[in-house]
Amino acid sequence: MKVVIELFGASRDFSNKNLIELDIKNNSTIKDLRGKILDYLDLNFKGNKNFIKIVNSSAFCSNNNIISDNYKITNNEKIAI
């Protein structure tokens, strides 16, 4: 399934569009999404260590609510970091 990740703060450097779109497996969690974002950073920014720190320390939210690493993502859901 496809998920749109809206980028805020320091994570805006991950894309010039202020968002990234990733394909993830059904029933993926925020923890899984962190891994996909790290894969994206490795591919596009050669594993930039500062970007990795941002992903590992950032909170995620959906519908203006902070969500935990075990939160299950739904299809076409917008997630923010």
Spans of features found by a protein language model:
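Ubiquitin-like/PB1-type beta-grasp interaction modules and other compact soluble beta-rich domains
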Residues: 1-81
